[in-house]
């Protein structure tokens, strides 16, 4: 059994406001992230993602950063982190992040018209973050070459689908009766 699948099946489940969440090192930073798990994930991303002509990897803060940093190191593709903090730099673009859990502003720097980007994130759940990010990247004039998320919470449609984008995923899961259930161990292509 691969490490990602095994780690998800062993993930602790917590209940918050009547909703069951799995707690995982990729999506939450706890429990401890083992290097062999991160390595496996990065190799799978590199094999699955469309990397031809990609100029930049774009990831929303915060939990996509460790994954995207490792992919950047392995591919020599520069990394842009979309931050929740405004810096006021020239060319900074704001976007609304509306998820099933919260609403906030995020800020894109260092992405320009004509850039070929790979969007990476840890989890695709409601799709709100990635729908907002893809809209901002479109407004900038960047070309979204591919979108890859490590884990998809397969609970139906999401805002990214509604925005007209498909994300590739490494594994698709649901939390059923207080346990993580693997829906598709190979994810979406």
From Swiss-Prot:
Pfam families: Pribosyltran. Its EC number is 2.4.2.-. It comes from the Archaea. GO terms for molecular function: transferase activity. GO terms for biological process: purine ribonucleoside salvage. It is an enzyme of class 2 (transferase). Keywords: Purine salvage, Transferase. May catalyze a purine salvage reaction, the substrate is unknown. NCBIfam families: HPT_Archaea (NF040646), PRK02304.1-4 (NF002635). Belongs to the purine/pyrimidine phosphoribosyltransferase family. Archaeal HPRT subfamily. This is HGPRTase-like protein 2. It comes from Haloarcula marismortui (strain ATCC 43049 / DSM 3752 / JCM 8966 / VKM B-1809) (Halobacterium marismortui).
């Amino acid at each position: 059994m691969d490490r990602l699948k095994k780690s998800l099946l062993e993930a602790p489940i917590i209940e918050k406001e009547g909703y069951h969440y799995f707690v995982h090192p990729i999506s939450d930073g706890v429990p401890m992230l083992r290097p062999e798990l991160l390595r496996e994930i990065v190799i799978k991303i590199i094999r699955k993602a469309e990397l031809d002509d990609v100029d930049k990897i774009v990831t929303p803060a915060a939990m996509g950063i460790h994954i995207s940093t490792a992919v950047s190191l392995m591919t020599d593709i520069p990394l842009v982190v979309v931050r929740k903090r405004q810096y006021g730099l020239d060319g900074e673009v704001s976007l609304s992040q509306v998820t099933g859990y919260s609403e906030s502003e995020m800020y894109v720097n260092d992405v320009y018209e004509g850039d070929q980007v790979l969007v990476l994130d840890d989890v695709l759940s409601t799709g709100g973050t990635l729908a907002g990010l893809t809209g901002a990247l479109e407004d900038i004039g960047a070309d979204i070459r591919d979108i890859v998320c490590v884990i998809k919470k397969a609970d139906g449609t999401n805002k990214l689908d509604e925005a007209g984008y498909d994300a590739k995923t490494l594994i698709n899961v649901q939390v059923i009766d207080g346990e993580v259930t693997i829906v598709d161990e190979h994810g979406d292509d």
